[in-house]
């Protein structure tokens, strides 16, 4: 049987630790004026033998917490004038006042309103065993502020205790005996009013932000992020943000109903019933005053306002014929020339292919007259001196075509006579206008003209810029390379740089990279030499 010298060493260490700890606790209690008691179960430093204990044993952590609470309660009695919340842990049997503490003036607890501040006590604190009720004050000056009405359900006594406690805190903030964990959250009266004002300003800012968000949601369709880039001309942009035909019809209908000769039955009818004829619809749409009013009320984009000022469609002639709109509609249905400029014969699309029209087929060059002129052996009078691609003229012709009563039968029975030929023209001078020459235009006659189905225009929606760049790369005619200078958008920049310039940029970039690498290598070698030396 071998002898183990370490046997029982752990038990001896535990016993020594318990003895030392109990000695210290008894000395601490004797300093506080309390009766010394044995803390550890069945153990006393004076008597080493075991004895049964009636009280249940407590864990060291729980025992330490109890002692700390007692110590805090005793230390907080002389400082009762400050904002100490530790009175909620006290009872009358625990209050012990030493002789040196009797010299200090004690605060009358009936006048201290901090005990009514239930919402200022920490959440982990136990409920108070008693509460001092303050006397009711007749003065109404300490009523609750209006900003707190509806927020808390506290009585007037709570608000009186709040302001009294805040005043006591502001008075005694300079002469505090020790740090308290509630010092940081203490507020004086001006600070409280500043916080209330800040809350009001924050609520106002939130309200204004909410209004801005709703305004942005309403005007998201007019946002420039849904418009095509400036170098690409959209077939949908000229219909995108104008007032719909139903809104214009309501406006014109209200104007007719207010006239003295208007019939009372039309006031309750459909707004477009008073414009059932094609000629009346075109006259109402081409009223210049009406269009200017709607543009000033509804349009805010400067580009569209410049387009209004630039178009020659707003003239004084309001009595246009339907055949002129049909002839101009035929010009809209011509296929746009490809970017190579080699297309000579452009034919009008038949009715069977209208449903398959894509954005490339509906593309219309706004500067058509400045690049091409129409030539034919048999000239006919167009009937108008000017031709415009403005959004209003396109809308008027579209509405006239869609509201025609005999559209389907007329559309299916007509045939195409002769294609129109386009040749390259010289650029216009400053004093010339972009108008169609009457002697060089041959359009189908009134009985043989062909209307286009514009229902696909209604289904087109605004396209984002990134999608437009992809479409322009796939369809070169969308980029309008024949009319515009080289563009600066990132999606089309690569296709407009010549080959020799691209090679030159590449060579320059390689040379600069080599120089930078050589300089970097020299610097690294110098640093290495300095480091080693």
Swiss-Prot record:
Keywords: Nucleus, Phosphoprotein
Keyword 4Fe-4S included in the entry's annotation: no
Residue numbers of Phosphoserine PTMs: 336
Ranges of biased composition (kind: Basic and acidic residues): 498-510
Compartment list: Nucleus
Biological processes, Gene Ontology terms: centromere clustering at the mitotic interphase nuclear envelope; mitotic sister chromatid segregation
Biased composition (Low complexity): 476-490
Superkingdom to which the source organism belongs: Eukaryota
Phosphoprotein among keywords: yes
GO CC entries: condensed chromosome, centromeric region; meiotic spindle pole body; mitotic spindle pole; mitotic spindle pole body; nuclear envelope; nucleus
Protein name in UniProt: Uncharacterized protein C2G2.14
């Amino acid at each position: 049987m071998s002898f183990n010298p370490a046997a029982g060493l752990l038990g001896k260490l535990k016993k020594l630790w318990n003895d030392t700890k109990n000695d210290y606790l008894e000395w601490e209690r004797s300093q506080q004026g309390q009766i010394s008691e044995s803390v550890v179960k069945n153990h006393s430093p004076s008597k080493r033998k075991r004895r049964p204990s009636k009280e249940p044993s407590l864990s060291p952590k729980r025992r330490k917490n109890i002692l700390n609470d007692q110590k805090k309660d005793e230390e907080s009695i002389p400082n009762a004038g400050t904002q100490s919340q530790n009175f909620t842990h006290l009872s009358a049997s625990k209050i012990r006042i030493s002789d040196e503490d009797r010299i200090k003036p004690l605060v009358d607890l009936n006048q201290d309103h901090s005990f009514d501040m239930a919402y200022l006590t920490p959440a982990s604190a136990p409920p108070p065993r008693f509460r001092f009720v303050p006397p009711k004050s007749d003065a109404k000056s300490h009523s609750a502020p209006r900003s707190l009405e509806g927020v808390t359900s506290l009585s007037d006594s709570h608000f009186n205790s709040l302001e009294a406690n805040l005043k006591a805190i502001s008075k005694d903030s300079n002469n505090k005996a020790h740090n308290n964990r509630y010092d940081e959250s203490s507020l004086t009266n001006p600070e409280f009013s500043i916080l209330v004002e800040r809350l009001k300003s924050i609520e106002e800012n939130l309200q204004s932000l909410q209004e801005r968000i709703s305004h942005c949601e309403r005007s998201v369709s007019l946002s420039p992020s849904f418009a095509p880039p400036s170098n690409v001309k959209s077939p949908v942009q000229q219909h995108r943000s104008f007032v719909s035909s139903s809104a214009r019809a309501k406006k014109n209908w209200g104007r007719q109903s207010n006239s003295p000769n208007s019939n009372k039955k039309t006031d309750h009818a459909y707004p477009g019933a008073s414009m059932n004829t094609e000629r009346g619809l075109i006259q109402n749409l081409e009223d210049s005053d009406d269009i200017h009013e709607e543009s000033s009320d509804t349009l805010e984009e400067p580009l569209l306002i410049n387009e209004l000022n630039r178009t020659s469609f707003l003239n004084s002639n309001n009595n246009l014929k339907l055949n002129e709109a049909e002839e101009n509609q035929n010009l809209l249905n011509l296929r746009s020339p490809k970017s190579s400029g080699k297309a000579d014969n452009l034919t009008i699309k038949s009715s069977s292919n209208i449903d398959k029209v894509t954005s490339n087929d509906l593309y219309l060059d706004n500067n058509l007259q400045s690049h091409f002129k129409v030539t034919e052996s048999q000239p006919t009078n167009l009937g108008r001196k000017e031709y415009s691609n403005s959004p209003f003229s396109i809308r008027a012709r579209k509405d006239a075509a869609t509201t025609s009563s005999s559209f389907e039968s007329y559309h299916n029975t007509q045939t195409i006579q002769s294609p129109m030929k386009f040749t390259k023209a010289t650029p216009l001078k400053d004093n010339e206008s972009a108008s169609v020459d009457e002697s060089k235009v041959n359009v189908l006659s009134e009985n043989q003209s062909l209307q286009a189905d514009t229902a696909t225009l209604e289904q087109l929606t605004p396209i984002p810029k990134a999608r437009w760049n992809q479409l322009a790369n796939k369809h070169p005619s969308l980029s309008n390379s024949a009319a515009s200078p080289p563009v600066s958008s990132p999606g089309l920049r690569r296709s407009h740089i010549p080959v020799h310039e691209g090679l030159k940029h590449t060579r320059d970039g390689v040379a600069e990279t080599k120089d930078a690498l050589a300089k970097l290598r020299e610097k690294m070698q110098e640093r290495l030499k300095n480091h080693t030396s």
